[in-house]
Every structure is written in C-alpha cells, then in structure tokens.
Amino acid sequence: MDIPRIFTISESEHRIHNPFTEEKYATLGRVLRMKPGTRILDLGSGSGEMLCTWARDHGITGTGIDMSSLFTAQAKRRAEELGVSERVHFIHNDAAGYVANEKCDVAACVGATWIAGGFAGAEELLAQSLKPGGIMLIGEPYWRQLPATEEIAQACGVSSTSDFLTLPGLVGAFDDLGYDVVEMVLADQEGWDRYEAAKWLTMRRWLEANPDDDFAAEVRAELNIAPKRYVTYARECFGWGVFALIAR
C-alpha cells in the first residue's frame, strides 16, 4: 500500500506536500484560535508538518493518517525533531474511510480530498470523526482563471475544467452542503513555486543517483515537461486554499 512512485520520488524532499508555506500554516494555526489540548485528525497527513508545528506552537494533540510509507516515516522523524512525539502520532494506512475512535475538535483533509472522491465526500467522511460544533478543514484547489479550453485544463494536469470550481463556486458549494465558512487561508504563487519547482531538483538528483532504475525513463519524461507545463498553464490557472467549516 503506497502512493504512486512518481510522487514518492518527486516530493521526497518536501516537508509540505501542497502549495502552502510554513508561514501559511502558521497563519492558519493562529486564526483557528486553538486551545492547548485541541484534538485533531488529519487525513492525508503527508510528512506531518501541520500537526507537528501546531503541536509545538499551540499545544494540540493529533493523529495523522497517510498511505505513503516514506512520508509517514518523515512525519515521525519531524515529530521527534520538534519534541512533540508524545502529542502527535502518525499511522501508515489508507485514509479513505478512516474514522477516529474518539471524536475530534478539528478534522482535516488538506489537499487529499481525492481519498473520498472530492471535497463533498471528504466532508461526509470527516463529519464522522468530528465533535458537534467542531471545525472541519478542507484543503482544495480551485480555478483562479478558468481555462479557455478543455485542452488547457488537461495541460494543467486535470481531465476537465469541471474537476474544480472557481473560488466563489467552491465557497458556494460549502454553503450548499450546510456549512458556514468561518475562516480561509489561500496559497499564493510563491507557495505554488515552492511546491512545484522543488520537485524538479529532487527528480534531477534522483536521476543522477539512479540512472539504471526501471523507473528512470518515467522520471526523465516528467522532468522534461514539468517546468514548462507549470509556468505555461498551472501557475496562472490554479489557486489553492484551506477552508475552515462549521456545520449549521
């Protein structure tokens, strides 16, 4: 059980597996006004940066679930590095369908709503682990600029323009699902650059170290196209944000 190898390779040096920066996560943690002891469930927790830094800065406790064995190991090391391994725990498992044994104050799926078929499915899943009145965090892409054609959308790495909504459309969809949007923090292009461009050096170094690997041709093909594809299409078209929701 693991994520596709191209992601394990290209994001192996990432601490954050989405377009947020450390500063954006710090802002999000601050605006949520969490008290020490706040219990958080994070589905698709990646390398654990959100839970680990919030445990350090806000005294939260939490559990992260991720199907990447590499990222889960990195999350555990990060918790030890920050001295919070008694507060946050990371489990290598498929987050799809995961429900916490004990209800949480905050239930999050930040950039991994695909585990439940999209943000609506993620909301249904997270709601099962959330205390009444608790905060749900959904991290989701949106169109900053709607692609003019389906071909441009596909060049952005999605199958169709219908895969994502605009920002007003996304906020409206949360409203339609019966949630108040009580906070949001949006990524900026600097965060997108750090997320995407960091992959390129990682892939290049991996190719240098593994020239005879059976997967090298696929990594080389991705590195050949990724920079131009990103700056031509995705950088201008994509937005991304984390939205804090409370059920009405």
From Swiss-Prot:
Subcellular localization, as worded in the UniProt entry: Membrane
One GO CC term on file: membrane
Entry's Gene Ontology molecular function annotations: methyltransferase activity
Keywords for this protein: Membrane, Transmembrane, Transmembrane helix
Topology versus the membrane: Single-pass membrane protein
InterPro entries: Methyltranfer_dom (IPR025714), Pre_MeTrfase_YjhP (IPR017031), SAM-dependent_MTases_sf (IPR029063)
Membrane-spanning parts: 104-122
Pfam families: Methyltransf_31 (PF13847)
Main subcellular localisation: membrane
Entries under PANTHER family matching the protein: METHYLTRANSFERASE, SAM-DEPENDENT METHYLTRANSFERASE
Official protein name in the record: Uncharacterized protein YjhP
Organism: Escherichia coli (strain K12)
Source taxonomy: Bacteria, Pseudomonadati, Pseudomonadota, Gammaproteobacteria, Enterobacterales
Gene coding for it: yjhP
